Amino acid sequence: MKIALLHIPFDKGVGWYGNNELKRLLLPTLNEAGIDVMLCGHTHRYSFRDVGSVDNNFPILVNSNNDKVNVRATKSQIDMEVVDATGKVLHRHTVKVE
């Protein structure tokens, strides 16, 4: 099981230079490494980027600056819950691990 933590998420090629430069430098290595999921922040808003959305071989969860992500990993899957300050679950994602 491989979980990557990166502050700045990758972008589709439009937008801020930093996102695109990190994508150019790191995405090929992470794709080759067999990453199961990548967790990010930086944008201060939630998003979930499916496999292939930014040439990625793994899903990317981007969390906001006001919520937390609870991650539970087993041999077969990674469960992620995005939870707000009141404890309400806003989003759930499960990634199967091979």
Predicted regions and their residues:
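Binuclear metal-dependent phosphoesterase catalytic core
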Residues: 46-98
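His/acidic metal-ligating clusters that form di-metal
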Residues: 1-56, 89-94
